[in-house]
Amino acid sequence: MREILHIQGGQCGNQIGSKFWEVVCDEHGIDPTGRYAGTSDLQLERVNVYYNEASCGRFVPRAVLMDLEPGTMDSVRTGPYGQIFRPDNFVFGQSGAGNNWAKGHYTEGAELIDSVLDVVRKEAENCDCLQGFQVCHSLGGGTGSGMGTLLISKIREEYPDRMMLTFSVFPSPKVSDTVVEPYNATLSVHQLVENADECMVLDNEALYDICFRTLKLTTPSFGDLNHLISATMSGVTCCLRFPGQLNSDLRKLAVNLIPFPRLHFFMVGFAPLTSRGSQQYRALTVPELTQQMWDAKNMMCAADPRHGRYLTASAMFRGKMSTKEVDEQMINVQNKNSSYFVEWIPNNVKSSVCDIPPRGLSMASTFVGNSTSIQEMFRRVSEQFTAMFRRKAFLHWYTGEGMDEMEFTEAESNMNDLVSEYQQYQDATADEAEYEEEEDAIQE
């Protein structure tokens, strides 16, 4: 079967990851001890995408947990599903990365990376036909960003033909945890552009807004934010784990979403988002789901899709529904908002349908879009980066770990290139594309 190996790094990654396993265990009917306690055979049919079956009939997540300090790991271990993970798959240091990308990537992280890779290899060898890796991390700290990107590049070397999917939490525009976030994020993006296949871009502020505005939570906790993320994560892979009429997997997703190799940063959304109290009072319809799914307020990163155009998009629907209706709704969205889709990629919205809805809902949908407006995120980080880098503020923390200023300059220009690539394709029209081809022909 097509297994996915899950890796979580740093405090943010481990907190999202542990929430994700709660959701997936719940979907597959696996209790906190790893025993199956579900009600339907469908839960077990492809349980091996995310789980290994141990000799005594227990299901063990294909998860690798890493961090440079023991704190978060301890709380995962004592959390509700802490006992389900394989104890050898916890890999942690003692020193911490102190929000320093260089520590995660070059010094502390580099010392720990080999023991992480050993665990990854062991897990990969346990797979029948490994499809790819999914990595949860944040880009603002030290471990998730520095060591996370180091691990991604090492895995890329060793498994060049497997998919590499990341769920990356970007620094938020208004809420900042650390001053050096722009540095860490820019250095990470520099790596992700080259080594990842698909990046789902998340950020806390957009998630807060969803909790506050849509879910009517007055004081959202990180647990609430992570629950939103894990609903999306589970939605992206539901087609692999449950039978459906139109299946998609990580590679199909990439083929349909990535027109140019560097432009693989996606916005994600989830529907239905209703506050916990009012869920049972409304029946859901496919048109409602579709409408909410495309709504800018539903996007889990602080970029507004109305400020750009969609190169491509993909929607995964879950639940019993007619594929014909799904197709009609998707075509409807494109026809009504044609100015928000680039016209030089016809039929650029793909949909897939999986028959099993998430727990407690009759139907749901997950949205993944490749929109040029994601450049707003990069632009914002880049401006903050430049403001500090111009004065060489905080640089000594990085050069002290053996980094060179040159690396910062490279990362900065790579990110600015990315922004202008998005801008270029946002402005491109179908006639222009033909015109350019003619020009090339003349020059040849």
From Swiss-Prot:
- Residues that bind Mg(2+): E69
Q: Does the keyword Magnesium apply?
A: yes
Which chain positions lie within coiled-coil regions? none
Which GO terms of the molecular function aspect are on file?
GTP binding; GTPase activity; metal ion binding; structural constituent of cytoskeleton
Tissue specificity here reads: Expressed in roots, leaf sheaths, anthers, and suspension cultured cells.
One Pfam entry name: Tubulin
Record bears the keyword Flavoprotein: no
UniProt similarity note: Belongs to the tubulin family.
Name the UniProt record assigns to this protein = Tubulin beta-6 chain
Q: What is the lineage of its organism?
A: Eukaryota, Viridiplantae, Streptophyta, Embryophyta, Tracheophyta
